[in-house]
Amino acid sequence: MLKVSKYVTGVVQTNVYFCYDDETRACVIIDPAANAPHIIRIIEEELHLKPEAILLTHGHFDHIMAAKDVAQHFGIKIFACADEAETLADPKRNLSGNFGVEVTLQPGEYETFRDGDTLHHLGREWKVLETPGHTPGSCCFYIADGLSFQPEGATEPKIYSVLFSGDTLFKESFGRTDFVGGSQEAIVKSIVEKLLVLPADTSVFPGHEAQSSIGNEQKYNPAVFLGRVNL
């Protein structure tokens, strides 16, 4: 059974996710934002996990600051969208320069994937959905058979799909598009055409703030109205 644990850290309160197999303790880390020593301590001492990969939803500094240190500590690889290379490599584009630091990931320091690729972790298929708009190479990760939950009175558990949406889709909102490389038109198109077409009971784990579901976003996300669609 897969489980998801969240740790909030950094100057803009970024959600770091640990998606793991409850039996094997194998783990995928999504967006190790900051405070590498504490992330490592949570993994080793609190959750007792065995990381096998780091996945990045996009290249802004508040989602990648701890990536290299965590990857080196556990001897694992970092994966990011190929179209996010410029953001990852440039402190101005990834916004770290705005805070007086230079955080970068250069080509060769991470592996790449593209839209439509399927990653294999924790015995599941993770579909890459490239969702430009917040940044040119923003992406989300979709697991069709993600979480198992047995409602009260049910004889069998129900399987829920999972979406790690980064800063593309938030609860009843979406990511900022006023940074370098951002586009409101692109993010609305990404959300409407790639995310809101997923099953309504899909659990959405965003890069900031509270969890949601696709069904909730189909009703209340402003992208629905900005995209002039009727879902």
Question: For the regions a protein language model found, what residue spans apply to each?
Answer:
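Conserved beta-strand hairpin/beta-sheet module of binuclear metal-dependent hydrolase folds
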Residues: 1-47, 140-150, 156-157, 161-164
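Hydrophobic residues at beta-strand termini and immediately following loops
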Residues: 7, 113, 131
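Conserved S/T- and glycine-rich ATP-binding loop of Class I adenylate-forming
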Residues: 19, 57, 131
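Metallo-beta-lactamase
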Residues: 25, 94-95, 125-231
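Active-site HxH/HxHxD metal-binding segment of metal-dependent hydrolases
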Residues: 27, 34-125, 146-150, 219-227
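Hydrophobic residues in well-ordered beta-strands that form the structural core
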Residues: 30, 78-80, 165, 206
